[in-house]
Amino acid sequence: MDMMMMSTRLIHLSRHFPQYGFRCHPSGLISSARMQYNINNGLAHMGKQMPNTSTHTTRIHPASFSSDLASRKYSLIYAFPLIRGLRALSRLKLLQTGITVVLLPTVYYLHLQGQASVLVLNRSIGIALFAGVMLYSISHFVRRVVGMMYLDSTQTILKVSHLSFWGHRRDIYVPVSDVVTLGDSGDSRGESILRLKRYSTSNTMYFSTRLGRVVDRHAFGKVFGSLS
């Protein structure tokens, strides 16, 4: 009697919930495999419709970070007027080296045609090599000369302007905490050429308080220490 009542209830449930796969077999047992398959399909379908609530961490790219630093307000604390002359010298050597390299194939062609001697060809090659070495040496020196230095309003970021290999202005942004003071760098405050050193890198740049001009001594002291 109890088995008949249970079968009747199962048949009643299977009519109302056919999507869940309830079936009453003659023996009165539910097909568990069929029910498990339909439940898995239902969960998979629900998983497709569920929105993705996972959180994503926004990554700060170096370009956006540099753009943020460039948009800050800076005050000039040091200027080197002779940087314009160094820029002109760098571009002149670049132009001279370019002309020499362009003329070298012409001299070689004239030598093949018998219109230029071996001595002229050797001199042309020597001049081209010398121009290349001089260009590299001058550019190596000029790129390490500080043209201007600025300090932001919070006095935490130092903007350093110098020349690139092509003679263009280039700005780098250095945390003040990363700058080595004059007392720790080993330079005497009375020296003509001082070193701009950082804790995070071995690259060294150079500036001069004699040939250059300290615009804001108080802000300059915040970065490099007192000049007195």
Swiss-Prot record:
Protein's cellular compartments: Mitochondrion inner membrane
Mitochondrial matrix side: 1-93, 142-228
Membrane topology: Multi-pass membrane protein
Cellular component GO terms held in the UniProt record: mitochondrial inner membrane; mitochondrion
Ranges that cross the membrane: 94-112, 119-141
Annotated gene: tmem186
Keyword match GTP-binding: no
One of the Pfam families matching this protein, by short name: TMEM70
Mitochondrial intermembrane side: 113-118
Organism: Danio rerio
Disulfide bonds: none
Described purpose of this protein according to its UniProt entry: May be required for efficient assembly of the mitochondrial complex I.
InterPro entries, per the entry: Tmem186, TMEM70/TMEM186/TMEM223
Protein's recorded name: Transmembrane protein 186
Coiled-coil portions: none
Alphabetized UniProt keyword annotations: Membrane, Mitochondrion, Mitochondrion inner membrane, Transmembrane, Transmembrane helix
Main location group: mitochondrion
Record's keyword annotation contains Transmembrane: yes
Family the UniProt entry places it in: Belongs to the TMEM186 family.
GO biological process: mitochondrial respiratory chain complex I assembly
